[in-house]
Amino acid sequence: MKASEWIDISQPLNNEIATWPGDTPFSYEVSCTKEQSGSVNIGKVTMSIHTGTHIDAPFHFDNDGKKVIDLDIHVYVGPARIIDVSSMDSIGVKELQQFNLEGVERLLLRTSSHGNAQKFPDIIPFLCAEIAPFLSKKGVRLIGVDVPSVDPLDDKELAAHHQLFQHGIHILENVVLDHVQDGDYELIALPLALTEADGSPVRAIIRPL
C-alpha cells in the first residue's frame, strides 16, 4: 500500500452487523426495483444512529445538548494519532501518561478487545472520566475507540461521555484499527448533516502522514 493511499477504518454496514441489545437492527432492502420503476433500483435503510462506526452528539446523553448539525465539522478532519492500549481493561490518566500526546488533536485508541462486528461484545475496555481534563490540556479535540462506547456497556451515568464533551472532546466509536499500525495519520470521519440527530454514522478513513 502506498503511503498516500486512504485506509478504511469503518465497520461495513450490512444486515448481519451487531447492534446494541434492544436497539433497531440494521436493514437494507431494495424497496423498488428497476423493473418496477422502469429506470432505477431504489434502496431503503432502517437503522439505529449508533450502529457501526459513528459519532455521538451531546444530545445523545443530554436533552439540552448540541445535535449533529451543531457540531464543528473541522474536528472530524485532520491529523490523528493511533496508540495501542490493548493490554488495558480501563484507560485512565496513568495509562495514557506513557504516551507522547502533546499537540495531538485527534486520538484513536486501539483496544483490540472485540474484532467481530457481527456480535455485540459482552464487556469492553472503557475510558475513565478523569482523562477528559488531561486530554483537553494536551490539545485533544476528538477521541476514537474501536468499541461501541467510551463508557462501560451497562453504565447509565455515562461519566466519560459527559466529561469528554464538557472539556470540548468529541466522540467517535466503533472504528476498526486492527489492520493499521500505531502512528500519525490524516483522518476524515465526517458525520451526515442531520439536523435533529443525537449521532451519525460516518465513513472513517485515514492515510499515513
From Swiss-Prot:
Q: What InterPro entries would the database entry show?
A: KFase/CYL, KFase_sf, Kynurenine_formamidase_bac
Q: Where does Zn(2+) 1 bind?
A: 50, 54, 56, 173
Q: Which UniProt keywords apply?
A: Hydrolase, Metal-binding, Tryptophan catabolism, Zinc
Which pathway does the protein contribute to?
A: Amino-acid degradation; L-tryptophan degradation via kynurenine pathway; L-kynurenine from L-tryptophan: step 2/2
The EC number(s) given in the record are 3.5.1.9
Q: What class of enzyme is it?
A: hydrolase
**Which residues take part in binding Zn(2+) 2?**
56, 161, 173
The Gene Ontology biological process terms listed for this entry are: anthranilate metabolic process; L-tryptophan catabolic process to kynurenine
Annotated cofactor note: Binds 2 zinc ions per subunit.
Q: Which cofactor does it need?
A: Zn(2+)
Which reaction(s) does its UniProt entry say it catalyses?
N-formyl-L-kynurenine + H2O = L-kynurenine + formate + H(+)
Q: Does the keyword Zinc apply?
A: yes
Concerning its family, UniProt says: Belongs to the Cyclase 1 superfamily. KynB family.
PANTHER family from the entry?
CYCLASE-LIKE PROTEIN 2, KYNURENINE FORMAMIDASE
| Role description | Catalyzes the hydrolysis of N-formyl-L-kynurenine to L-kynurenine, the second step in the kynurenine pathway of tryptophan degradation.
Q: How does it assemble?
A: Homodimer.
The name this protein carries in UniProt is: Kynurenine formamidase
Give the organism the record lists: Bacillus cytotoxicus (strain DSM 22905 / CIP 110041 / 391-98 / NVH 391-98)
Primary gene name = kynB
